[in-house]
A protein has these predicted regions:
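Flexible, acidic/histidine-containing loops and adjacent segments that form or flank the divalent-metal
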Residues: 15-212
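Metallo-beta-lactamase
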Residues: 1-8
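Residue-level marker for buried hydrophobic side chains located in beta-strands
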Residues: 1, 213-215
């Protein structure tokens, strides 16, 4: 289960899928471009705006993933998680028949192994729609006209763009020297935690026998 598009989650999984020992993965739960964005935004006929749209996607992809300064794992070849899942032909979101993992589509306990169950708490369909709307707004601000149907390039650009949207909510790091600084820092954390990217994350309870674990 990849709960959300964050570099500290995605980059490690990308390294696994880029290797040769990934056959132990039978299924992936992950809400990517095809699960979040309605097909009408990538199924339009090409027209005079297509070349311009491709340049916008190229710009986003060329910037790649935002990485932390001290992060050792990175994307060497600009390959996104969604693209790798498709290329490796790994079943995606089987519990939701390939659609987005959300509380409305996976309503009951889902048995992933003998005596091991997952109960989806979130996101909701509304959270998914809200993230889609935010992404569309960001793309429109770039004068994107939604005239590209290349799912691979769209998937890659989408993941990179979402990471940057999340960064908008991140609180700037600063040294806490006084109580007032601490309150500002806490306030910043609250704003970050309420971002649409975090609200659209997959949250769930993992159950095994009489034990429950919250993720």
């Amino acid at each position: 289960v990849c709960t959300h598009m964050d570099n500290d989650h995605i980059c490690g999984l990308i390294q696994v899928l880029k290797g040769t020992n990934f056959n132990f993965i039978e299924n992936v739960w992950y809400n990517g471009f095809l699960q979040i964005v309605n097909s009408r935004f990538y199924s339009q006929k090409e027209n005079i705006f297509t070349e311009k749209d491709n340049k916008i996607l190229d710009e986003i992809i060329s910037q790649g993933m935002l990485l932390d300064v001290d992060q050792e794992v990175g994307i060497n070849e600009g390959m996104s998680l969604g693209v790798l899942i498709e290329e490796r032909r790994i079943p995606l979101n089987s519990a939701a028949r390939g659609q987005a993992i959300c509380s409305e589509l996976v309503k009951n306990k889902y048995e992933i192994a003998p005596s091991i169950f997952i109960t989806i708490l979130g996101p909701s369909k509304d959270n998914i729609i809200e993230l889609e709307e935010y992404w569309k707004k960001e793309m429109v601000s770039r004068n994107y006209m939604f005239r590209v149907s290349d799912k691979r390039r769209l998937t890659e650009a989408f993941e990179y763009q979402i990471e940057r949207i999340k960064a908008i909510y991140a609180n700037e790091c600063f040294k806490i020297s006084e109580n007032e600084d601490l309150m500002k820092y806490i306030g910043g954390l609250t704003e970050r935690d309420e971002s649409i990217v975090n609200r659209s994350s997959i949250s769930f309870i993992l159950e095994y026998n009489d034990k429950k674990f919250l993720f």
